[in-house]
């Protein structure tokens, strides 16, 4: 799947996978030591934003600019920066 596929998929205003982190990230977040976190293939940002709300310095990367734009909006709505 390429960037065009994901840009089309993330073009809708709603968050395809929701705004809450996935179960794995929610369960394991407390095990991540303080500091920088790199979130690869982050999509719409739900995991990155969750980690940022816990105080991590998060860099989110994805091939979809549409997904990253939604991630930035979600981060702003939660008062964090990714």
Give names to the regions the model predicted.
Residues 71-72:
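Conserved SAM-binding loop
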Residues 1-32, 35-43:
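Conserved class I S-adenosyl-L-methionine
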Residues 44-56:
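Conserved SAM-binding loop of SAM-dependent methyltransferases across substrates and taxa
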Residues 33-34, 54:
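Residue-level preference for short coil/turn positions at secondary-structure junctions
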Residues 57-62:
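Conserved SAM-binding motif I beta-strand of class I
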Residues 78-82:
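Conserved SAM-binding strand-loop segment of SAM-dependent methyltransferases
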Residues 64-66:
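Conserved SAM/SAH-binding beta-strand->alpha-helix loop
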């Amino acid at each position: 799947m390429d960037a065009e596929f994901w840009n089309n998929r993330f073009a809708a205003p709603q968050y395809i996978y929701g705004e809450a982190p996935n179960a794995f990230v929610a369960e394991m977040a407390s095990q991540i030591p303080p500091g920088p976190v790199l979130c690869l293939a982050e999509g719409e940002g739900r995991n990155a934003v969750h980690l940022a709300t816990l105080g991590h310095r998060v860099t989110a990367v994805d091939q979809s600019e549409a997904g990253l734009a939604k991630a930035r909006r979600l981060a702003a709505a939660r008062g964090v920066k990714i």
